Amino acid sequence: MIGRLRGVLTSKTPPWLVVDVCGVGYELEVPMSTFCELPDVGYEVNLFTHYTQKDDSAALYGFLSESERRLFRHLQRVSGIGTKIALAILSSVSVDTFAGLIQAGDANALTVIPGVGKKTAERMLVELRDRAADFNNGISTSGKLNLDTVSEAALALQQLGYKPAEAARMARDAGTESDDVAIVIKKALQTVLR
């Protein structure tokens, strides 16, 4: 239907935005990972899209990368996961990190994501394990220990008052090769203070 939009960003209020394409304003809902990377209003954007039609409503979702959209679509096929949880997952972790968690079989790390409980995490592991390479472009992700460290750091940042999605993003962006949670937290907080 609508696979991609390129136009001028005219409105931006999390998690919604409006993109003007030749005089038509398309309203899209985007994950916070996409929202945080968008330019200011008035600049051109290029987004991959996913259109859904339900009984009484239609919705358009936007993503910066093809791999984000691909993961969103794979998540929609998992029993019990709707658009809200799929967006929460994409807002909390990168595609590569998520693929690494699936490949490592780490249900506990998945439960850190808002809206994902133990049963949902286990269901995702079962239903997505064979497809993990599909949504991260075949990139091999290593470091289960590093992913555990990032998850622990995200939990610690939540305890400091950061919202779950923001804490997950901060920990992911600060993730290092170190297995020391304190180092990841320190790096995340230093980035915020700059």
Swiss-Prot record:
GO terms for molecular function: ATP binding; four-way junction DNA binding; four-way junction helicase activity. The keyword Cell wall biogenesis/degradation does not apply. It comes from the Bacteria. Residues 145-194 are annotated as: Domain III. Gene3D superfamilies: 5' to 3' exonuclease, C-terminal subdomain, DNA helicase RuvA subunit, C-terminal domain, Nucleic acid-binding proteins. InterPro entries: DNA_helicase_Holl-junc_RuvA_I, Hlx-hairpin-Hlx_DNA-bd_motif, NA-bd_OB-fold, RuvA, RuvA_2-like, RuvA_C, RuvA_C_sf. It is found in: Cytoplasm. This is Holliday junction branch migration complex subunit RuvA. It comes from Xylella fastidiosa (strain Temecula1 / ATCC 700964). The gene is ruvA.
